[in-house]
Amino acid sequence: MQKIMHISVLLSPVLWGLIFGVSSNSIQIGGLFPRGADQEYSAFRVGMVQFSTSEFRLTPHIDNLEVANSFAVTNAFCSQFSRGVYAIFGFYDKKSVNTITSFCGTLHVSFITPSFPTDGTHPFVIQMRPDLKGALLSLIEYYQWDKFAYLYDSDRGLSTLQAVLDSAAEKKWQVTAINVGNINNDKKDEMYRSLFQDLELKKERRVILDCERDKVNDIVDQVITIGKHVKGYHYIIANLGFTDGDLLKIQFGGANVSGFQIVDYDDSLVSKFIERWSTLEEKEYPGAHTTTIKYTSALTYDAVQVMTEAFRNLRKQRIEISRRGNAGDCLANPAVPWGQGVEIERALKQVQVEGLSGNIKFDQNGKRINYTINIMELKTNGPRKIGYWSEVDKMVVTLTELPSGNDTSGLENKTVVVTTILESPYVMMKKNHEMLEGNERYEGYCVDLAAEIAKHCGFKYKLTIVGDGKYGARDADTKIWNGMVGELVYGKADIAIAPLTITLVREEVIDFSKPFMSLGISIMIKKPQKSKPGVFSFLDPLAYEIWMCIVFAYIGVSVVLFLVSRFSPYEWHTEEFEDGRETQSSESTNEFGIFNSLWFSLGAFMQQGCDISPRSLSGRIVGGVWWFFTLIIISSYTANLAAFLTVERMVSPIESAEDLSKQTEIAYGTLDSGSTKEFFRRSKIAVFDKMWTYMRSAEPSVFVRTTAEGVARVRKSKGKYAYLLESTMNEYIEQRKPCDTMKVGGNLDSKGYGIATPKGSSLRNAVNLAVLKLNEQGLLDKLKNKWWYDKGECGSGGGDSKEKTSALSLSNVAGVFYILVGGLGLAMLVALIEFCYKSRAEAKRMKVAKNAQNINPSSSQNSQNFATYKEGYNVYGIESVKI
């Protein structure tokens, strides 16, 4: 059993004499306050002081308890009754209402309460809170809702819900009723989010919140978290304290929010009370010292006034009221009711006064009648009264605005505010913009597009640059949209014409037209330095595999030619002199030895030829196919040689997103607020998820505030930073001086830029049709060519593309010179070796001949002559070419 904290406030006779006068008449008043109702208790105390009288004094006995605990309520009520109270003020909920009403009816003790009104007849219960059913049904009909969700707190009873369901059955409304009163506090945030996500799947964007302030605030927090507080959503807060909640956090979301207000702050009586209320000390009166008051606190203050007025009327009627001898046990069996309790009930029901909650009057059942409830709507400048509801007049609208909040006035009569962003080449300041005014200060793709859209739709427009320079993203903590999206969501602009990417999260809060430009995320890097050709770059036209095959083919052809020449009888012939006479020797010769075969193949490959040619058919077949082979190879080589020698190629260290993700030397990042960052954050693809993990944890941060900052970082990083941005912007910057950036790889995704309007805007259809028409006319492509390529500064091939051809430098052909010098050197070396070899051989021969002469002197002369002739023949004759 939970222990009840019992607080009895008994003011001393001296103090009460100072407050209420010198009269000793004391009227005991009970009070049952729930824990945490500090402001209500402060209002109760202020009322005790405010409505004091010299005729009698009210003496309160206060109990703070859990009103949901029926046992605690029973003990407190019986304790109050045994003290001899004349009436009890207090609160109840659905668990304790039957206990309290039963005691009141049995013991004839009047109970004045600001809690929710009950159905049926409950004697001795005076209900300070007006019934909201009639006003709520009238507001639903005013908004012409026929399909909505109804979220209710079962702790407040089900009477209002039952009335709505009865009307729904009669008028064929589609109502989704959901009880949020039993949601576990530990998981409430998650459950609220899940609830509204389920409603979104059902396209339920009209919601009634039949809850008290604290629960409404909890629900609104989660509505903001999941982005359901924007245009296109409408909420009705079904309690009497529209201004009691924290409306500031949802005020600029764009959603329509309506409700009811029982305390009219424009009323003079309320204004005077607030002046005094705001001067009270917070420590002495918790919840005071503010310029507002909760409607339950206002009803508490009014209840004190009603009790005071009732007892004053009894005094005027000279009806003596006393509890002497009547303070008994409330649990006695049989129960003994208080005999004079009926007189007090009658006096309370007959009270008619003006209070903080307006006109206070009761019917025979103790329920409020002849009251007025203000109808409120939340505007961007705060809560605003749009009308009121009363039992006689029903709903009366005093503010002539359409309930939907959409502007349907003619476009031709309105200057449309167009928000955009300074981003080349979409929107740029003209060089002489300081001398111009209005839209004339700007130029660019989107400036021309805005003019065309306005011409097709027939409206005047004003270009404004977004204040924070952002495209639009929702803050993870505050859930507030920034950038151009925020200006649309919060009603600061009518349309956004800019390079704004169409994404799911943005589509949830704003409307997009058909894409006016298709694009994707691409990689920008600093253009690498052109690679200089190598010493042997003349070998590049053919792959190394081909060169190896040519070498083997050369050797193979030479060997085959040698073998064919040896086996073919037609390749052998006798030697002839220059005058045509044959030698007297019968020996046949063959010119295609192995070295001559190699020389013949080399000469044919170099297209130079040699002095010998095959005589046999087989040898000529070998030579023919070799000539054909060399013809094709040399022609192909020559065709590619010019391109390889004159074009300086750029070697990029990065070719794709995979290359970026696999290395850490080159940093990479995106715009800090935009769709590109969202793409990586939400992507489930392994490569992109790996890139996002790196980007969000990189130090220093790889994110940049603007595209210009990202481009500057690429240019200054010396190839150590890559910037991820839309391909269209990448292509544009590549065409701008100093022409030192380039796009690498393909696009990472496919998306489009669209023109954005607020949810439900009347501009949406007109703008959409205009975009389609411009696309069919080819004007969109014409605008892109104008601002991307016609005004480009680097040409199609970069900054040096103006030169048609590049002159060959020494480095292009250095290898050829090296081979020439090497060949000459090799020839001289071989010649030296041959000379040395021949000299040594000649020395040996001369030595042998001299020795022979010494042995046979008689024949030395003839032998010498013959040797001299033979040597001359070997050196200069035909044999000099024989192997």
Swiss-Prot record:
Residue positions of covalent lipid attachment, annotated as S-palmitoyl cysteine: C610, C836
Example GO molecular function: amyloid-beta binding
Catalytic activity from the UniProt record: Ca(2+)(in) = Ca(2+)(out); Na(+)(in) = Na(+)(out)
Pfam family membership, one: Lig_chan-Glu_bd
Main location: membrane
Keyword Aminoacyl-tRNA synthetase annotated: no
Modified residues (Phosphotyrosine): Y876
Bridged cysteine pairs (disulfide): C78-C330, C739-C794
Gene Ontology BP annotations: chemical synaptic transmission; ionotropic glutamate receptor signaling pathway; modulation of chemical synaptic transmission; signal transduction; synaptic transmission, glutamatergic
Region (Required for interaction with IQSEC1) residue spans: 867-877
Residues in compartment: Cytoplasmic: 565-591, 611-616, 834-883
Post-translational modification summary for this protein: Palmitoylated. Depalmitoylated upon L-glutamate stimulation. Cys-610 palmitoylation leads to Golgi retention and decreased cell surface expression. In contrast, Cys-836 palmitoylation does not affect cell surface expression but regulates stimulation-dependent endocytosis.
Location(s), subcellular: Cell membrane; Postsynaptic cell membrane; Postsynaptic density membrane
Membrane topology: Multi-pass membrane protein
Membrane-traversing stretches: 544-564, 617-637, 813-833
Annotated effect of mutating Q607E: In NEDLIB; homomeric channels show increased ionotropic glutamate receptor activity; decreased localization to cell membrane
Modified residues (Phosphoserine): S683, S717, S860, S863, S880
Annotated SMART domains: Lig_chan-Glu_bd, PBPe
CDD domains in alphabetical order: PBP1_iGluR_AMPA_GluR2 (cd06389), PBP2_iGluR_AMPA (cd13715)
UniProt keyword annotations, A-Z: Autism spectrum disorder, Cell membrane, Disease variant, Disulfide bond, Epilepsy, Glycoprotein, Intellectual disability, Ion channel, Ion transport, Ligand-gated ion channel, Lipoprotein, Membrane, Palmitate, Phosphoprotein, Postsynaptic cell membrane, Receptor, Signal, Synapse, Transmembrane, Transmembrane helix, Transport, Ubl conjugation
GO cellular component: AMPA glutamate receptor complex; asymmetric synapse; dendrite; dendritic spine; endocytic vesicle membrane; excitatory synapse; external side of plasma membrane; neuronal cell body
Gene3D superfamilies: 1.10.287.70, 3.40.50.2300, Periplasmic binding protein-like II (3.40.190.10)
PANTHER family: IONOTROPIC GLUTAMATE RECEPTOR
Task performed by this protein: Ionotropic glutamate receptor that functions as a ligand-gated cation channel, gated by L-glutamate and glutamatergic agonists such as alpha-amino-3-hydroxy-5-methyl-4-isoxazolepropionic acid (AMPA), quisqualic acid, and kainic acid. L-glutamate acts as an excitatory neurotransmitter at many synapses in the central nervous system and plays an important role in fast excitatory synaptic transmission.
Disease link: Neurodevelopmental disorder with language impairment and behavioral abnormalities: A neurodevelopmental disorder characterized by global developmental delay, impaired intellectual development, poor or absent speech, and behavioral abnormalities, such as autism spectrum disorder, repetitive behaviors, and hyperactivity. Some patients develop seizures and manifest developmental regression.
Protein name: Glutamate receptor 2
Protein's organism: Homo sapiens (Human)
The gene coding this protein: GRIA2
